[in-house]
From Swiss-Prot:
<dbReference type="InterPro" id="IPR006689">
    <property type="entry name" value="Small_GTPase_ARF/SAR"/>
</dbReference>
<keyword id="KW-0813">Transport</keyword>
<dbReference type="InterPro" id="IPR024156">
    <property type="entry name" value="Small_GTPase_ARF"/>
</dbReference>
<keyword id="KW-0931">ER-Golgi transport</keyword>
<comment type="function">
    <text>GTP-binding protein that may be involved in protein trafficking. May modulate vesicle budding and uncoating within the Golgi apparatus.</text>
</comment>
<dbReference type="GO" id="GO:0006886">
    <property type="term" value="P:intracellular protein transport"/>
</dbReference>
<feature type="binding site">
    <location>
        <begin position="34"/>
        <end position="40"/>
    </location>
    <ligand>
        <name>GTP</name>
    </ligand>
</feature>
<dbReference type="GO" id="GO:0005794">
    <property type="term" value="C:Golgi apparatus"/>
</dbReference>
<keyword id="KW-0653">Protein transport</keyword>
<keyword id="KW-0547">Nucleotide-binding</keyword>
<dbReference type="GO" id="GO:0005886">
    <property type="term" value="C:plasma membrane"/>
</dbReference>
<dbReference type="InterPro" id="IPR027417">
    <property type="entry name" value="P-loop_NTPase"/>
</dbReference>
<keyword id="KW-0342">GTP-binding</keyword>
<dbReference type="Pfam" id="PF00025">
    <property type="entry name" value="Arf"/>
</dbReference>
<keyword id="KW-0333">Golgi apparatus</keyword>
<dbReference type="InterPro" id="IPR005225">
    <property type="entry name" value="Small_GTP-bd"/>
</dbReference>
<feature type="binding site">
    <location>
        <begin position="75"/>
        <end position="79"/>
    </location>
    <ligand>
        <name>GTP</name>
    </ligand>
</feature>
């Protein structure tokens, strides 16, 4: 109930400001397992710097202006006990961003299941929502390649969903803008 209130208030102000600027509004839900780098990525995009973060308990909301978009980005914590709450925030989502720690191969089955859950839960409500997967931590030792991640997560089976895997390093900023360029080209915002 409280999340719906915040959602409505935030959407109202985003819509008002964007009307004056001629930008399309989109709602983004940024999710992923704990420790994947969601908040680091969000704040690198927002402020251009690495901001020291602590594990997100609940959510962070930022409005990011990028090219012709005004993006209302909801960064939701990824701890196991918080993931059940993802469903509370996904109404009217235009783009799902799933951030993956591309060095943590032991959790790829868990990532695959969570992506499957999100898509299954949103068959009707956000069926046109695009899916951007950031393969984060590419600056670390031995990260998985995008092609390997596509195979590991069986993404080619998502035939009714626009999706893209973007390698990135949230700390260095590599690949972040390319991912958001994909969103500009593939989102159906208002």
């Amino acid at each position: 109930m409280l999340s719906e209130f915040f959602n409505n208030i935030t959407s109202f102000f985003v819509n008002i400001f964007s009307l004056f600027e001629g930008k399309r509004n989109i709602r983004i839900l940024m999710i992923g397992l704990d420790g994947a780098g969601k908040s680091t990525l969000l704040y690198k995009l927002k402020f251009g710097d690495v901001i020291r973060t602590i594990p997100t308990i609940g959510f962070n909301v930022e409005i990011i202006e990028y090219k012709n978009l005004s993006m209302n980005v909801w960064d939701i914590g990824g701890q196991n006990n918080i993931r059940a709450l993802w469903r509370q925030y996904d109404q009217r989502t235009d783009v799902f961003i799933f951030v993956v720690d591309s060095t943590d191969r032991e959790r790829f089955d868990e990532v695959k299941q969570e992506i499957k859950n999100i898509i299954e839960q949103n068959k009707n409500e956000s069926s046109n929502a695009s899916l951007l997967i950031f393969a984060n931590k590419q600056d670390m030792l031995n990260p998985i390649t995008p092609a390997e991640l596509v195979n590991s997560l069986d993404l080619n089976s998502l035939t009714n969903k626009k999706w893209h895997v973007q390698p990135c390093s949230a700390v260095r900023g590599d690949g972040i803008y390319e991912g958001f360029d994909w969103i500009v080209s593939n989102s159906s915002g208002k």
